[in-house]
Regions:
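A glycine-rich, hydrophobic/aromatic-adjacent loop/helix-cap motif
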Residues: 1-220
Length: 220
């Protein structure tokens, strides 16, 4: 997943933030339709598992009956999604993490009890899917207690929000300048790095990005 907390930058906490002076971007796809498809594909007699890879680890915002470290194969965490409200602006877009095809990703899976699953998923949708930019997928997540199928918010390389490859100069410029209503892209990167480290998760790409920020005097 991941927005910083949402697809192209809206959040369930929008009412707590200043009202923007311009209208938010139009949805890429119909979020309501995607939600109904996801609900229809979930066995409502079972608990709901959700995979978090960035802000859902350090700010899940839903009651989890259980959480486990987990690894997904076939997708990796990448700082390659534009953020034009939360961590940047339309004039100076920031970046947030997304789950992109290829490689693997270690994160956290959360179990939401079935009695609360639909209500919590609807809340989560308002946070992550207001513009329908993510591709919600059920992914096999491997944990020490066994595999679980969890909902993950992935990003297609064909998405208009996918940045593609960014060279170091472009990344440094974004880390130096991009700031949105929830703070800067740099703060988001550093917070994610600290959270993953505290969870015992190593991400070499993030470590490299943090080191790059330090070399340019952007982080201590």
């Amino acid at each position: 997943m991941q927005q910083d907390f949402a697809a192209d930058d809206l959040d369930a906490r929008a009412d707590e933030a200043p009202t923007p002076a311009w209208a938010p971007p139009a949805p890429v796809r119909d979020p309501a339709l995607l939600l109904e498809r996801t609900l229809a594909s979930h066995d409502r007699t079972s608990d709901l598992w959700v995979f978090g890879y960035a802000s859902l680890i350090w700010r899940p915002e839903f009651p989890a009956a259980e959480q486990r470290l987990a690894r997904v194969h076939g997708h990796h965490r990448a700082l390659r999604m534009h953020s034009r409200i939360n961590r940047g602006t339309p004039e100076q877009p920031g970046l947030v993490f997304a789950l992109v095809r290829g490689g693997s990703c270690q994160g956290m899976v959360y179990r939401i009890e079935r009695e609360r699953a639909e209500a919590e998923l609807r809340r989560l949708w308002r946070r992550e899917m207001p513009s329908g930019v993510y591709d919600p997928k059920w992914l096999q997540c491997h944990t020490n207690q066994g595999p679980v199928s969890a909902l993950a918010f992935t990003l297609s390389r064909h998405s208009p929000n996918y940045t593609g490859e960014l060279d170091d100069d472009a990344l440094v410029a974004i880390l130096r300048h991009a700031r949105g209503r929830f703070g800067s892209t740099l703060e988001y990167l550093l917070k994610t790095a600290v959270c993953l480290r505290d969870c015992g998760i190593r991400d070499l790409a993030i470590e490299r990005q943090v080191a790059l920020a330090r070399r340019h005097g952007l982080a201590a």
